[in-house]
Each structure stands twice: as C-alpha cells, then as structure tokens.
Amino acid sequence: MDGEQLGMIGIAAGLFGLLVAFFLYNKVNSIKIENETVAKITGRIYDGAMAFLWAEYRLLSGFIVVVALALLLGGEENGLGFETMIAFIIGAICSVAAGFSGMRSATSANGRTAQAAADLSLIHI
C-alpha cells in the first residue's frame, strides 16, 4: 500500500468519523428537556461556555498570526515557509472548529442527560 492509498484511507476514516459524530449529536439533541429549570440552567451553561470560547479564541488569534508570520519568514531559506504557514493555519482552524463543536455538544448534552435519567426514573428533577 503506497502513501496515496493510505492518505485516502485516512480521509475516508475522518469523514466516517464526522458522520458518526453528526449522527450522535443529532440523536442526543432530539431529547427534549421537559423541566423548565433544567432547560434554563442548560442554556446558561451553554451561553457561558460560548462566551469563554469566544474570549479565548479572540486572544488566541493574535498568537496564531504571530506564529504564522514566524513560520512564513523562518521558512524562506528552504522554500517551505508558505506551505508550513498554510498547514499551521488550517490546523488552527480545525482546532477551533473542534473546540466549538465539542463544547456545544458537551453543554447541550448536560441537561439532556439529566432528562434521560429522569425519564428512566434514575433521578428526580
């Protein structure tokens, strides 16, 4: 198996993983939170988490710009500065997307987990 085939397998596995994650996210989000207090708390946790991420990524964006420029200028000797900078920026964007989707999934699941446990009479809310 050559490198190109391995690359295609990696891409296919990544896309499959995204599909599974999307399916599970939608399955969890299909659970309705019936308790008004739990729904309100879940909403506030979500709002706080998103505010934190926006503040963090706003700060991080300056770091990303500085490192990207350092990669661009530092790689002029071997001619790989531009390519390395682009790879770094793509990685940073993917990291931000993973952070947002992970935080959104986690905060969304909190209240729904409590609701599902209550539906099974495991807890009283």
Regions found by a protein language model. Name each.
Residues 33-36, 115-122:
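Juxtamembrane helix-boundary/capping and inter-helix hinge elements in multi-pass membrane proteins
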Residues 2-98, 102-106:
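N-terminal alpha-helical transmembrane segments of multi-pass membrane transport
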